């Protein structure tokens, strides 16, 4: 049986933790002037992937 391939795009975006998969939040790349400082600060925080998306990410990261 051949080795399973890791999806490199997913590997760069998600990190496996004890509680699930950690990810960066969206909406912090451009058009930042109209967003408040508080909103941008909260968007810097990492969050966990939703429970519905975990199986798909786990399939793409077989060795995580």
From Swiss-Prot:
<dbReference type="GO" id="GO:0022625">
    <property type="term" value="C:cytosolic large ribosomal subunit"/>
</dbReference>
<dbReference type="GO" id="GO:0003735">
    <property type="term" value="F:structural constituent of ribosome"/>
</dbReference>
<keyword id="KW-0687">Ribonucleoprotein</keyword>
<keyword id="KW-0689">Ribosomal protein</keyword>
<dbReference type="Pfam" id="PF01632">
    <property type="entry name" value="Ribosomal_L35p"/>
</dbReference>
<dbReference type="InterPro" id="IPR021137">
    <property type="entry name" value="Ribosomal_bL35-like"/>
</dbReference>
<dbReference type="GO" id="GO:0006412">
    <property type="term" value="P:translation"/>
</dbReference>
<comment type="similarity">
    <text>Belongs to the bacterial ribosomal protein bL35 family.</text>
</comment>
<dbReference type="InterPro" id="IPR037229">
    <property type="entry name" value="Ribosomal_bL35_sf"/>
</dbReference>
<dbReference type="InterPro" id="IPR018265">
    <property type="entry name" value="Ribosomal_bL35_CS"/>
</dbReference>
<protein>
    <recommendedName>
        <fullName>Large ribosomal subunit protein bL35</fullName>
    </recommendedName>
</protein>
<dbReference type="InterPro" id="IPR001706">
    <property type="entry name" value="Ribosomal_bL35"/>
</dbReference>
């Amino acid at each position: 049986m051949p080795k399973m391939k890791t999806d490199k795009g997913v590997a760069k975006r998600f990190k496996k933790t004890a509680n699930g998969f950690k990810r960066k939040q969206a909406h912090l790349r451009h058009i930042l002037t109209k967003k408040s400082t508080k909103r941008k600060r909260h968007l810097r925080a990492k969050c966990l992937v939703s429970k519905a998306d975990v199986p798909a990410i786990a399939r793409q990261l077989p060795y995580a």
